[in-house]
Amino acid sequence: MEINKNDNNNNINNNNINNNNNNNNNNNNNNNNNNNNNNNNNNNNNNNNNQNNNQKNNYRNYKPIKTGTLIQHQILQQTLSNFQTKNKVFQLGSDKLILIFKENETIYFHGTIQARSIIGSVEVYGYTITPQSTTYYPIYSPFCSPTLSITSNNSNNKLYTLKEIIENQLIKIPELVKNKLKENEKQIEIDEPTLAISSIIVLKILDDHCENPKMFTKKKIEIIDSFKLLKGFYPLYQPDFNTQLLTIPNEWLNLINTQFLYNDHCNNNGLSILTCGERNVGKSTFNRILINKLLKKYTHIIFIETDTGQTEFTPSGIMSIDIINSPLLGPPFTHCKNNPLKSYFFGDTSPKNNPEYFLNLSFQLIDCCNLIKQQYPNIPIILNTNGWLKSLGLHLTQEIIKYFKPTSIVQLINNNNNNNNNNNNNNNNNNNNNNNNNNLNDNLNNFINRFDSTVTFSQDCINQLFEDCDDDNDDNKNLKTTIITKLYSINSINNFSQSIYKPIFNLGSSEIRNLMFKSYFKLESKGSLSHQSPYQVSWKELKVKILTNNVPPSQTMYALNASLVGICIDEDPEKNYKYISYKVGNNLPTIINQSPLISQCIGLGLIRSIDMVNGYYYIITPIDPSLLEISNTILKGSIEIPQTLTISVSSKGKILVPYLQLDVLSSYGTGSDVMNRPSFFDD
């Protein structure tokens, strides 16, 4: 395939195709989804405002603080971190600090940092950092996520005296650290003669470039004197801004420790866990903690992603399988991957528009996992599902469970039944004199609960699923196997949260997806998409498929222009598409007019423009050119590139949005040469 890097963006002909017709087939779906998200966000904001008003008397100098379009509130007067800095923090070189922890000490913080343990161990996001590893672990605690913490791991730590650490030859610590402790030994003993040390760590500035840096900084924030050396690290003691702490429920830890980490009584096939639950119950948080805990016992973990709306390692719309060998110490956009082990482009945030294709891709990922298990039978597996557990969504989840055959299912549940019961009791008391009204209210509540109540699995339900599988395999006894799957139902993280607050940058689902796209396309290091040089790709060997709606072949190129696409490799193109493809003309790529067979996705790309005369796509993508050269299929779904990724600023400071301008001839009455469409970026 002919691929050239086009360094002159001005040579790209953006007028070959009328961009105003771009992707009309997907606008209705996106608008509906956005409206639903906005309604949900409005409801959540109303609930939060009511809670904040109820707590008004408890605030310290209660004053709303306007941040952009959000109204934040000051937090309760309490100290978050209990780590004592006096004679416990010492500078080591130009970019490191030594921290001495006592028992039960914690530092809550925002920002970025690298941490290494010297004595004892500390916990971060469920992961235990031990002295056995000389690695500095990068930790990301953005202002848009719950606040992370570094906590001394008291359950496993022996307590030391400072003299013992310095003089005991059996305690191996770096010489530079030992010398620094010797220098400050007298000062520490004078201040606290009976100091019992639980752990000693070294913090280091995170020099690596971080995508989405605005999420890790705040214009006005109090910096503790002891930590001023560490640029970008903000410990929280009594912050004057809104924050939400990440608290890991003991119920979660007990389940992981007793059933997964220290329990060897799983099936002979090894540990395989499927996590499920409705939206906003904390599945992603639980999966990260589960991975971090399992890495204490296993060196590698297989992770299967089937939630296309809130992905962990890739941008939205991609279903993937990957092998994890390092802890996840931050939100998804801090560990976004360009090259997972294997991925498939689904092209939508929900399976409702193409459920059959969704199941086919899910089964393909599970088949890939089974091939890995044949070679490494003891490697644990985690499969993440989406939050759609009603009607068709419930059926899809059941089909995945039957095909995956996990040893364990973890179900996260929101327990809101108490509130519903209280409301029902109040209604009954108010209507005791009117039996007809009581009956009407009861019937109405029962009808609503049938559709609005949380859908949950039971152990009997799971057993019945596999009994049905055995019945289907009665004709083939070789396929009939005994499947033991245990169901664990635990409370969602919302039931344990002691804070009524949200992160200072309280982002919605679409905004979180935008952060993943920014990380994937590396906009901070490479600049906005409008400034990146595209690849010039010949379409002679490329097949094209629009996954959503029916787009006439004559309109396919209009739909592709300025759109986000999945770039794929069809390993057997002649066999797969011999009878379901055709060409509109000799100078156009092959159009797939039926459901595509499964082809591996090597990454995403933005088709910036199309040269209809010479037959080229101009594609912006982080994919390696050697992989791009062997690609032969382009798939387009309903996911569009966020506008925030393409904007640029003119020399006069005006925000420019590509593809949102109307060029007109300058004549009497037109007013100006260019009329900009209104957008939310305009002041």
Curated annotation (Swiss-Prot):
Keywords: ATP-binding, Coiled coil, Kinase, Nucleotide-binding, Nucleus, rRNA processing, Transferase. The keyword rRNA-binding does not apply. Its main location: nucleus. Its EC number is 2.7.1.-. Residues 1-58 have a biased composition (Low complexity). The keyword Kinase applies. GO terms for molecular function: ATP binding; ATP-dependent polydeoxyribonucleotide 5'-hydroxyl-kinase activity; polynucleotide 5'-hydroxyl-kinase activity. It is found in: Nucleus, Nucleolus. ATP binds at residues 277-284. It comes from Dictyostelium discoideum (Social amoeba). GO terms for biological process: cleavage in ITS2 between 5.8S rRNA and LSU-rRNA of tricistronic rRNA transcript (SSU-rRNA, 5.8S rRNA, LSU-rRNA); maturation of 5.8S rRNA; rRNA processing. It comes from the Eukaryota. Belongs to the Clp1 family. NOL9/GRC3 subfamily. GO terms for cellular component: nucleolus; nucleus. This is Polynucleotide 5'-hydroxyl-kinase nol9. InterPro entries: Clp1/Grc3 (IPR045116), CLP1_P (IPR032319), P-loop_NTPase (IPR027417). Residues 420-454 form a coiled coil. Polynucleotide 5'-kinase involved in rRNA processing. Residues 1-61, 414-442 are annotated as: Disordered.
